[in-house]
């Protein structure tokens, strides 16, 4: 396949055109007065969104050189979204500014490597300042609500929903987003630990109306192999039955012979018993059984530990306040495990989350963490039309991610003010040479850009507002939603520090690569010959009877 190659200023100019095309489409969504972008879909209604990364993902340019530039900035937006969950539009605006001003200087003869060094120096200083401005959220759910509301494009109802969901399942809990059947947005909470395995036989059901097996204060037997013959099972079954308490059996599987015996006993002697399969597969199954054991204060009966089923005693069984088993799910509420053991297990899973690189593993570990630390909340997003539903779901997702980032690294004043305050840290900062100092000035100018854009989207003059905010101190800034200058912290206009930091770091990283690019290679478009026309005279079959 033949390639097209461009060098120096030609290459950089084409890349910049692509950057501008993408950034101009994305930046109109920034801030409380951000505009909508309508995206045509091949099938169904067009998608209306204010989510920067959704817009960025849709941009594909016809010119290969320009498209390369656009794709690079798209990667800034995506990476910021992945790392911090929000701030995609801010990162795009910052990248556009650094690239734009930087290229002017490179064209005027500045050394790109020195510019990059200056940019990196300035970014390090700004990041330091952002960290020092950050205020930890702790257990203050009012602040959590503010962050969520701002990220959901200033929708206080979404902010309240997310804060309520976090109250119910703790900050470590898993919160998932699903589409509601009606127009209302509501929260559903599954308390305790739930896993997706139901009863092995419908004869275990105690509540025939709901088709559920409900047990109060049951013993819980956790076994990591298949229960195939009853002989091994009887030594633990008999004392459990004599105690008069129900018994929940969690095992890899229960053979038909053993299952039949359990069912017959259940029906004849009203033996309160239920058997379910263990959740998960392979190593994940072992880990989940261990989680259940820690939560209920029991032990996993496993031959790996030198324990056989016939050696099991009542002391090895877990217990809890209540178990509900349906056709598809088992829920364990208020396990009797020791608090410190559960906390230790939670810390262990958190450490695994930090160390894993796979998104899939991270998601699964996060689920396990939630099940141990309080439960799972589901936000059911409702809207009047499918188009509105998609747009609202985007915003709820943004808000949820931003809230998690705020819990991690704290909050800073929103509305681009954190960057303006951070620029004070650049006063008097000099590079080792003139070009490095220019690099520092590029960042100083770029970090004003988010505020300028927020103001421009609100229909005001950016330069005037930036000057006024710069004259203020601390949390003083411009609230674009209400069009007043005030203490943004008090007004609830706050951003997660992590989002602010990650957006700048990623933007500067890609922009630095741009400035030091000397050659771009793309695939040459081949002109395909047009399809030949059909043979003449085939238009009709005239004259045939």
UniProtKB/Swiss-Prot annotation:
It is an enzyme of class 5 (isomerase). It catalyses: ATP + H2O + a folded polypeptide = ADP + phosphate + an unfolded polypeptide. InterPro entries: Chaperonin_Cpn60_CS, Cpn60/GroEL, Cpn60/GroEL/TCP-1, GroEL-like_apical_dom_sf, GROEL-like_equatorial_sf, TCP-1-like_intermed_sf. PROSITE patterns: CHAPERONINS_CPN60 (PS00296). The keyword Nucleus does not apply. GO terms for molecular function: ATP binding; ATP-dependent protein folding chaperone; isomerase activity; unfolded protein binding. It holds the Pfam family Cpn60_TCP1. It comes from the Bacteria. Keywords: ATP-binding, Chaperone, Cytoplasm, Isomerase, Nucleotide-binding. The keyword Signal does not apply. Its EC number is 5.6.1.7. Its main location: cytoplasm. One of its GO terms (biological process) is protein refolding. SUPFAM superfamilies: GroEL apical domain-like, GroEL equatorial domain-like, GroEL-intermediate domain like. One of its GO terms (cellular component) is cytoplasm. ATP binds at residues 29-32, 50, 86-90, 415, 495. It is found in: Cytoplasm. PANTHER family: 60 KDA HEAT SHOCK PROTEIN, MITOCHONDRIAL (PTHR45633). Together with its co-chaperonin GroES, plays an essential role in assisting protein folding. The GroEL-GroES system forms a nano-cage that allows encapsulation of the non-native substrate proteins and provides a physical environment optimized to promote and accelerate protein folding. Forms a cylinder of 14 subunits composed of two heptameric rings stacked back-to-back. Interacts with the co-chaperonin GroES. Belongs to the chaperonin (HSP60) family. This is Chaperonin GroEL. It comes from Phocaeicola vulgatus (strain ATCC 8482 / DSM 1447 / JCM 5826 / CCUG 4940 / NBRC 14291 / NCTC 11154) (Bacteroides vulgatus). The gene is groEL.
């Amino acid at each position: 396949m033949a390639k097209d190659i461009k060098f120096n200023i030609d290459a950089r100019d084409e890349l910049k055109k692509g950057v501008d095309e993408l950034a101009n489409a994305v930046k109109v969504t920034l801030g409380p007065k951000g505009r909508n972008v309508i995206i045509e879909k091949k099938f169904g209604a067009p998608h209306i969104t204010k989510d920067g990364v959704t817009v960025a993902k849709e941009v594909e340019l016809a010119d290969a050189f320009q498209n390369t530039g656009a794709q690079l900035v798209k990667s800034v937006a995506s990476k910021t979204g992945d790392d911090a969950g929000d701030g995609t539009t801010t990162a795009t605006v910052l990248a556009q500014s650094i690239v734009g001003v930087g290229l002017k200087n490179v064209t005027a003869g500045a050394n790109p490597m020195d510019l990059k060094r200056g940019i990196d120096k300035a970014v390090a200083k700004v990041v330091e300042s952002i960290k020092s401005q950050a205020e930890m959220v702790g257990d203050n759910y009012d602040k959590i609500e503010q962050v969520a509301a701002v990220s959901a494009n200033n929708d206080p109802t979404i902010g309240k929903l997310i804060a309520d969901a976090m109250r119910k399942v703790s900050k470590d809990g898993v919160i998932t987003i699903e589409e509601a059947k009606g127009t209302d947005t509501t929260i559903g909470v599954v308390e305790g630990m739930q896993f997706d395995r139901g009863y092995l036989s419908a004869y275990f059901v105690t509540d025939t109306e709901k088709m559920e097996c409900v047990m109060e204060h049951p013993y819980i037997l956790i076994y990591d192999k298949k229960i195939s013959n009853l002989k091994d099972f009887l030594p633990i079954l008999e004392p459990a039955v004599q105690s008069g308490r129900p018994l929940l059996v969690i095992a890899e599987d229960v053979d038909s012979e053993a299952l039949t015996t359990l069912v017959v006993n259940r029906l004849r002697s009203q033996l309160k018993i239920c058997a379910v399969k263990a959740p998960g597969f392979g190593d994940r199954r072992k880990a989940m059984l261990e989680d259940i054991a820690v939560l209920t204060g029991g032990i996993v009966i496993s031959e790996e530990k030198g324990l056989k089923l016939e050696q099991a005693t009542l002391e090895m069984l877990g217990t809890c306040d209540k178990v509900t088993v349906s056709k598809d799910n088992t829920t364990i509420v208020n396990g009797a495990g020791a608090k410190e053991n559960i906390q230790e297990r939670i810390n262990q899973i958190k450490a695994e989350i930090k160390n894993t690189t796979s998104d899939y593993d991270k998601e699964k570990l996060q689920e396990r963490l939630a099940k141990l630390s309080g439960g799972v909340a589901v936000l059911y997003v409702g809207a009047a039309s499918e188009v509105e539903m998609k747009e609202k779901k985007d915003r709820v997702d943004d808000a949820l991610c931003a809230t998690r980032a705020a819990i991690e690294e704290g909050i800073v004043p929103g509305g681009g003010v954190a960057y303006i305050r951070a620029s004070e840290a650049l006063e008097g900062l000099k590079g080792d040479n003139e070009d490095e100092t220019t690099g520092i000035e590029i960042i100083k100018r770029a970090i004003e850009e988010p505020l300028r854009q927020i103001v421009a989207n609100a229909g005001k003059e950016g330069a005037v507002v930036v000057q006024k905010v710069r004259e203020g101190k601390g949390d003083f800034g411009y609230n674009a939603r209400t069009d007043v200058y005030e203490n943004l912290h008090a007004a609830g206009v706050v951003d997660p520090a992590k989002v602010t930091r990650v957006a700048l770091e990623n933007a500067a990283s890609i922009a630095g690569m741009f400035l030091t690019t000397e050659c771009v290679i793309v695939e040459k478009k081949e002109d395909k010959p047009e399809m030949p026309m059909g043979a003449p005279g085939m238009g009709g079959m005239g004259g045939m009877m």
